[in-house]
Design a protein with these regions (language model features):
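GIY-YIG nuclease catalytic motif and its immediate N-terminal context
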Residues: 1-55, 83-98, 102
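Coupling/hinge elements of helicase-like and P-loop NTPase modules
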Residues: 102-109
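A broadly used, surface-exposed interaction patch
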Residues: 52-73
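Canonical phosphoinositide-binding patch of PH/PH-like domains
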Residues: 75-83
Length: 109
């Protein structure tokens, strides 16, 4: 469990081993930080169904990989938002992006 922007996220999980749940919510793509057990967010996104969202096909995947060096250094953390609307998830994503200013998010506010 990790807290980002006041929200509890499950994980971080190694991206290659992550089994995406059939749930909606927010996600953070992360790499290990400089200190033990710390992580740095590269990207925040939202999905109507995590299980339908293959992050290896994301347009920014190659950039994330260039930072991580290998997919074994890419992690994902998720915050499930059952019964959420796309607009609600997008607003939450914008808030996280404005707070953290990750390198590869489109909405840097």
């Amino acid at each position: 469990m990790i807290t980002l922007g006041g929200r509890s996220f499950g994980g971080p999980f190694l991206l290659p081993l992550w089994s995406a749940p059939a749930a909606s919510g927010l996600y953070a793509v992360m790499v290990p930080g400089w200190r033990l057990l710390t992580f740095r967010a590269l990207y925040f996104g939202q999905a109507g169904d995590f299980s339908q969202n293959d992050l290896r096909r994301h347009p920014r995947y190659a950039e994330w990989l260039s930072i991580g060096g290998t997919d074994w250094n890419l992690y994902i953390a998720t915050h499930e938002m059952p019964f959420s609307t796309e607009a609600g998830r997008q607003a939450a994503e914008r808030n996280l992006t404005c707070s953290y200013r990750p390198e590869f998010s489109e909405n840097k506010g």
